[in-house]
């Protein structure tokens, strides 16, 4: 899971 990319 990626956040703020």
UniProtKB/Swiss-Prot annotation:
The modification Threonine amide is found at residue 5. Expressed by the skin dorsal glands. The keyword Secreted applies. One of its GO terms (biological process) is defense response. Transmembrane segments: none annotated. It comes from the Eukaryota. One of its GO terms (cellular component) is extracellular region. It is found in: Secreted. Keywords: Amidation, Amphibian defense peptide, Secreted. Its main location: secreted. Shows neither neuropeptide activity nor antibiotic activity. This is Rubellidin-3.1. It comes from Litoria rubella (Desert tree frog).
């Amino acid at each position: 899971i990626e956040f703020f990319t």
